[in-house]
Amino acid sequence: MNALARRAAGLLLSTVLLPLSALAADQQPTHEFRLDNGLKVIVREDHRAPVVVSQVWYKVGSSYETPGKTGLSHALEHMMFKGSNKVGPGEASLILRDLGAQENAFTSDDYTAYYQVLARDRLGVAFELEADRMASLRLPPEEFKREIEVIKEERRLRTDDQPMSKAFELFSAMAYPSSGYHTPTIGWMVDLERMSVGELRACYEEWYAPNNATLVVVGDVTPDEVKALAQRYFGQVAKREVPVAKVPLELPTPGERLLKIHV
């Protein structure tokens, strides 16, 4: 490599690394604390734009479910948008949309999470809505009757009609014969067909407690601001006894397992 090429390469490298080093220098520390009711709060400051991301993570997911009751965590995620003490079905989403916010939720093997992205001065609205459904979810039977059909159609579209998704589902069932990782997050269709509001209510009351949740806020905020808002809204939610989650265990491998899929 000649001198000109080395100089050009060095300039290119410095151009790439300089923004990264500046970003590393600007990173703010992560703050963590708990409310008296056990809610864990994590705050990460990022003042580049007047925006915040607010997330509530519950320590429950499809791996917590038992045979015959699969899909409860995912179905409950859907029903969390169907009304609580302060708002009716879908009203929380309309409030957030009018504020220009984005929201969504997702369920996995070990957790269920809900989040909003919105202006920093609207964080209290997100907290109020999230705390309300943590404390007083309604679960109207008529809403469940409609929503379970949406979930079943979601399963048909994303799993039953998708060879790769179906193959992975069967692979997981074979790879984890003993633990909760055996079952798909959306649940088996036979369990969706017989799911009841009572089962969802039991799941909600068991796991959706402040002492089984983590509130994460990242954005243009300070820890003191978040702590004050969290105490104002989430601090009023009563702590509840939460079951001890079983550690996922698998039996010793009995030997070679073979899965054949014909498509």
Q: Predicted regions span which residues?
A:
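Short pre-active-site segment immediately N-terminal to the catalytic Zn-binding motif
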Residues: 61-69
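M16/insulysin-pitrilysin zinc metalloprotease superfamily fold
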Residues: 83-86, 117-148
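Active-site SXXK
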Residues: 70-84
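Non-catalytic accessory/assembly modules
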Residues: 142-149, 162-170, 217, 221, ...
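Non-catalytic beta-strand/loop surface segments
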Residues: 23-62, 88-122, 158-212, 236-263
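Non-catalytic, conformational "gating/processing" segments within enzyme and secreted inhibitor domains
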Residues: 148, 198-233
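Bacterial N-terminal signal peptides
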Residues: 9-21
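N-terminal secretory signal peptides that target proteins for export/translocation
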Residues: 1-6
